[in-house]
Amino acid sequence: MIRTVRSHLNVEAHSHAGMTGKNNEDRYAVASFVLDDNNKMPVLFAVLADGIGGHRGGEVAADLAVNHIVQAAAKSDGRHIRDTIEDVIVEASDAIAAHSASKDELKGMGSTCALAWIVGDKLHTATVGDSRIYMMRAGRIQQLSTDHTWVQEAIEKGILTPERAREHPNVHVIRRYLGSPEPPEPDFRLRWFDDEGDQGDESNQGVQLLPDDVLLLCSDGLTDLVWDDEILEIVRSKPSLKEASRSLVELANSRGGHDNTTVILISVPSNFKLTVKNDAGWLPWIIGGAAGVLLILVVGSVLTFGLLRRNSSVTSTPTTRPLFTQTPLLQPTNTPVLPATTATPQLILPIAPTYTPWPTNTLIP
């Protein structure tokens, strides 16, 4: 893919270390692209990582995660998204594990990951850990991702209610993370509708975004302290994504801010209309010429056939293929906010000029 300076969607991000004096171990990156020189399909890529580990371990792990993932996405052609994500998650996890083993003070470090890869108006997501992805549409909010935590498993098995899970001692026990001894499996389930099952959730990858849709990627510093309906109300009531992002973080901090909090908000403009400029050089002329020759051959064949079968007439009934339009109605989620690990400062990839609002992240040697 080719980097571009501006995104075709509205984006705002904000990160805060919290109120306990700890370092910010959250990292994020947002970058815009087009697929290639011949296909100007716009692409937006966003990733958030919440570092795990004492000393500087969480910061280092989150840095490694974001840098590996963003640079791999940038080098890809943007056409084999799932394969690219699966590969880069393993690579990032292995890099974190190797770095952790190289220094005693970094042992046991890891990171969560939540990413959104938007090609045109098609949404693709993947998560590892308890950083979340939400969709807000038509006055409703839906958690698209599934937490990889002990309490989430307990909720699914009916052992805990969502309300009790929030106060459980194991609320911060994560089942999947980058840097684990065995590379984690990225979760491609996209919970667009309720009760679709894992296979149905995965089939929602590539779902179409609509005007005024808002996506939220966030670390658990937000969702530990702010409920889903509160997130929705803030995003709906604020005049801009910038104000909404800051208000979300401020609310978490006002309730103790015991962890780092990072949010990335992505909205589809109200007047959004996808237009793609394709520059293929001589290709259109070649295709046009070939089509012209083919047309002459077809017409000649028809005339010849008509002369030979003057008294015959053949009519064929054209087939019609209905257009499938997917405009899902999101259902409100009753699952409250849970888990936590560690989080940190705002960053952005160091691959080229970034979309103005964010600083540039520095690579770790």
Identify the residue ranges that each predicted region occupies.
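PP2C/PPM-type serine/threonine phosphatase catalytic domain
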Residues: M1-I364
